[in-house]
Amino acid sequence: MVIRWRHVVGVLVACILGAFLVTWSGLISIKASTGHWRITDIVLHWVMRSSVRSAAIGTKVPAFTKGMLPMAAGHFEAGCAVCHGSPAMPRPDSVAKMLPPPPDLKDKIVTWSDAELFLIVQHGVRYTGMPAWPVADREDEAWAMVAFLRRYPELDGDQYRALTGFTAIASQGMDRLIATCNGCHAPDRLRPESLIPRLAGQSSTYLEQALIAYANETRRSGVMAVAIEKLTEAELKDLAHHFAGEGADPMPLLAGDLFERGQTLALKGDPSRGVPACLSCHDKAEANPSYPRLSGQPAAYLANQLRLFVEKKRGGGPFKEVMTRAAAKLEANDISALAAYFSARDIADQNAPN
């Protein structure tokens, strides 16, 4: 028999039609309860690992700092532990019936490189239930999570609770919400290297506008998106009022070249480069209550926020465009100097909370 093109085409059409009929018939089971065939499981994991490995090629890994850990740990407790469990609490039995089931990360993290972990955290994994980071343009937060995951396998329950600010309380009211916020934002948890802002000393206007901006996604943060996703606007306002009423402890003034450079920029700006003076708007008597108070904030937090403004990723309340323009000409050394200055600036120099 001579095989002609029409025979080949006929076989292909028959195969396609057969595949369609099998799929349409519903004979292929999609039950999670029965699991995958072993070969299916092997192929799916092979494809996933190969894809992540290739996508991670050329990814530049930033330096990790201790300041990354508390923010990422708090997010892990709020958004990840419900599936993966944690050193403080085992994962719920219900998620064990997912297909594939979320793994215990203590044993899995060591099998991935930093770049590969970033790809998984930032983009998620299809067909596994592993979501992408809640917002697409906050790679800095995803890298903080990678820094935390690197530390995760060595944490015991007490170390995990200390890092996350984990608090288990019975109340379901405002006390619970305040305790949850303080798990990250409590003043005694903040250090110069913290990426978490100090809330005490801010105006209720600024805090309310910031929280509503997070809720409306005009200020984008995967960490805050998860933290406030279940809160009503009334609860956001109550939280803003509460934290605005907390006093801010004075901070000692520090000397040094970086501090002095930051002080000059804050007081005078740099007119030759179009950089305005920060203190013409911030931290002065009768300042616009929508402007945040900068004195006493962790240096790492301030530097990160300024970088986000420079990169046009920051967002925020009604005056976000003002700050985007003000920060546009800042260079890396300017950001470091301003962060050092305002972090060390005496809070007593600024106006009392509204």
Residue ranges and their predicted role:
Residues 162-165, 258-259, 305:
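N-terminal targeting leaders
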Residues 86-87, 187-188, 284:
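Cys/His-rich metal-chelating microdomains
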Residues 178-183, 256-283, 287, 291:
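Short, solvent-exposed interaction modules
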